[in-house]
Regions:
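Active-site-adjacent beta-strand/loop module that shapes the phosphate/pyrophosphate-binding cleft
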Residues: 18-19, 27-31, 131-151, 163
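Short loop segments at secondary-structure junctions
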Residues: 30-32, 57-59, 69, 144-149, ...
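Nudix hydrolase/Nudix homology domain
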Residues: 1-11, 67, 81-82, 86-88, ...
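Short, solvent-exposed loop/turn elements at beta->coil junctions and helix N-caps
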Residues: 12-15, 126-131
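Conserved Nudix-box catalytic region and its N-terminal flanking loop in Nudix hydrolases
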Residues: 42-45, 59-109
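A short coil-to-beta-strand element that immediately follows conserved catalytic motifs
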Residues: 8, 118-125
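Acidic, metal-coordinating catalytic segment for phosphate/diphosphate chemistry
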Residues: 17-60, 68, 78
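N-terminal presequences and immediately downstream first alpha-helices
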Residues: 1-27
């Protein structure tokens, strides 16, 4: 929703190019009063698009989540909260969208790799930027049903613990404010608002 406002990029160069990229951008934009802002230097963490999927077992009235070690969750934790300083995080199945792959294909691939469930027809809940002040990462959030018969393999992609959490347990975590993954929190709110229609 830019409303036709102008943006001018004077320069853009890559400062770091590895698994992720960091670009330096000199940019100005049209302000709300109609004038152009002065040039500003911005750094953009180029992460690419990612998927996340809420796996729902309606028969067991539970969700399938994963727990794994994520270094940034350890480094970024506040030092005054030692109880949460272990680096393991409970989250949705999630991953990067590979080159030449659709978001839906990535959902199916990552779900099989991380949990062993072979899903079909994932439904897009929405898409959003995870941290638009500094990152280009866009999340495609999906919903998919799972049943015991869809568990076709162990799931061997990474060092991951697969968790089956009751829907009530998920909603309790949401109410207590102990979900520390934004994708999971958004999905839990979505499920809370839509469970009667599923």
């Amino acid at each position: 929703m830019t409303g036709g406002r102008r943006v001018e990029i004077s320069s853009q160069k890559c400062l770091f190019d590895d698994f992720f990229k960091i670009d330096e951008v000199i940019v100005s934009h049209q302000q709300y009063d109609g004038r152009m802002s002065t040039d500003a230097r911005r750094l953009v963490f180029e992460r690419g698009d990612v998927i996340a999927v809420l796996l729902f077992d309606s028969e067991a009235r539970s969700v399938v989540l994963v727990e794994q070690f994520k270094l940034p969750s350890l480094i970024g934790r506040r030092r005054d909260d030692p109880a949460t300083m272990n680096g393991w995080i409970t989250e949705l199945v999630a991953g990067m969208i590979d080159a030449g792959e659709t978001a839906e294909e990535a959902v199916i691939r990552d779900t099989l790799e991380e949990t062993g469930y072979l899903i079909r027809n994932p439904r897009l809940i929405g898409k959003f930027f995870s941290s638009p002040g500094g990152s280009s990462e866009r999340v495609f959030l999906y919903f998919a049903r799972v049943t015991v018969v869809q568990k076709v393999e162990k799931g061997v992609g990474e060092d991951i613990k697969v968790l089956h959490i009751s829907v009530d347990g998920l909603f309790d975590r949401l109410a207590q404010g102990v979900i520390d993954d934004s994708k999971l929190a958004i999905a839990a709110y979505w499920l809370q608002n839509n469970i009667g229609r599923l």
